[in-house]
């Protein structure tokens, strides 16, 4: 009984505003040191799971969906078709090789668009930002998550090459409910390995990013088909030689 009381007392001190006010700098330092150490490790080894996978699993369990399963198969970039590599860059981040994690030109364009348009919010997240968010953070539109995304992206760019960032992005991006990574997506939708994806298949997968819950690969809307066609044009403009600079 005394042991239980001591545990609750320790927890009450840990979560008290006074404790956090006194120790927040130490907590932040330890958090980013741990993130930095993990990024150094994951620079060389396959990623076993991402924070977003864990978030989705827990969310479904809390909703009573015990049948929810994560489909995830890690593959190296050499075993991923250049078509899908080029497709996601064409769709999500055409200045991927030029920026250091943040595309300020895209941010300015998004701000101007959002000020003038009533059609919804346009984002400007780079592949690096999306990778940092999916790997280390949670999804949601709040300032805390957005604030943490900035240093997380900077650490990612500091410790990983562009090639590694793209490799991890392609392996942990969600392409459907519980379907993570291009290998799992390729096998689920097209019954083939990611190594053998055609240009049309790659563009269709990229067209549902970054919101594959609303936009479906297996039931593509007119909007998805239009985006697929646009991605194919952009792939032609970039050219496969773009990937040689990774």
UniProtKB/Swiss-Prot annotation:
Its main location: membrane. Peptidoglycan polymerase that catalyzes glycan chain elongation from lipid-linked precursors. This is Biosynthetic peptidoglycan transglycosylase. It is a single-pass membrane protein. It catalyses: [GlcNAc-(1->4)-Mur2Ac(oyl-L-Ala-gamma-D-Glu-L-Lys-D-Ala-D-Ala)](n)-di-trans,octa-cis-undecaprenyl diphosphate + beta-D-GlcNAc-(1->4)-Mur2Ac(oyl-L-Ala-gamma-D-Glu-L-Lys-D-Ala-D-Ala)-di-trans,octa-cis-undecaprenyl diphosphate = [GlcNAc-(1->4)-Mur2Ac(oyl-L-Ala-gamma-D-Glu-L-Lys-D-Ala-D-Ala)](n+1)-di-trans,octa-cis-undecaprenyl diphosphate + di-trans,octa-cis-undecaprenyl diphosphate + H(+). It is found in: Cell inner membrane. Belongs to the glycosyltransferase 51 family. Its EC number is 2.4.99.28. One of its GO terms (biological process) is regulation of cell shape. InterPro entries: Glyco_trans_51 (IPR001264), Lysozyme-like_dom_sf (IPR023346), PBP_transglycosylase (IPR036950), Pep_trsgly (IPR011812). Keywords: Cell inner membrane, Cell membrane, Cell shape, Cell wall biogenesis/degradation, Glycosyltransferase, Membrane, Peptidoglycan synthesis, Transferase, Transmembrane, Transmembrane helix. The lineage of its organism: Bacteria, Pseudomonadati, Pseudomonadota, Gammaproteobacteria, Pasteurellales. GO terms for cellular component: peptidoglycan-based cell wall; plasma membrane. The chain crosses the membrane at residues 27-47. SUPFAM superfamilies: Lysozyme-like. GO terms for molecular function: pentosyltransferase activity; peptidoglycan glycosyltransferase activity. Pathway: Cell wall biogenesis; peptidoglycan biosynthesis. The keyword NADP does not apply. It comes from the Bacteria.
């Amino acid at each position: 009984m005394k042991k239980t009381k001591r545990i609750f007392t320790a927890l009450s001190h840990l979560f008290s505003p006074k404790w956090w006010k006194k120790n927040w700098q130490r907590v932040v330092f330890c958090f980013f040191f741990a993130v930095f150490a993990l990024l150094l490790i994951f620079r060389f080894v396959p990623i076993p799971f991402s924070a977003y996978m864990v978030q989705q699993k827990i969310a479904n369990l809390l909703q009573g969906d015990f049948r929810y399963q994560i489909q995830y198969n890690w593959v190296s970039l050499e075993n991923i078709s250049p078509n899908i590599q080029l497709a996601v860059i064409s769709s999500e981040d055409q200045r991927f090789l030029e920026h250091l994690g943040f595309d300020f030109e895209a941010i300015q364009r998004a701000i101007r668009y959002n000020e003038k348009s009533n059609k919804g919010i346009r984002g400007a997240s780079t592949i690096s930002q999306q990778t940092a968010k999916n790997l280390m953070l949670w999804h949601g539109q709040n300032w805390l998550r957005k604030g943490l995304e900035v240093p997380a992206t900077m650490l990612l760019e500091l410790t990983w090459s562009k090639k590694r960032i793209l490799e991890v992005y392609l392996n942990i991006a969600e392409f459907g409910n519980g379907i993570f990574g291009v290998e799992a997506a390729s096998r689920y939708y097209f019954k083939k390995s990611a190594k053998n994806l055609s240009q049309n298949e790659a563009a269709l997968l990229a067209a549902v990013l970054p919101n594959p819950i609303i936009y479906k690969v297996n039931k593509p809307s007119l909007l998805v088909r239009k985006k697929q066609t646009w991605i194919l044009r952009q792939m032609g403009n970039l050219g496969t030689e773009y990937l040689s600079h990774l």
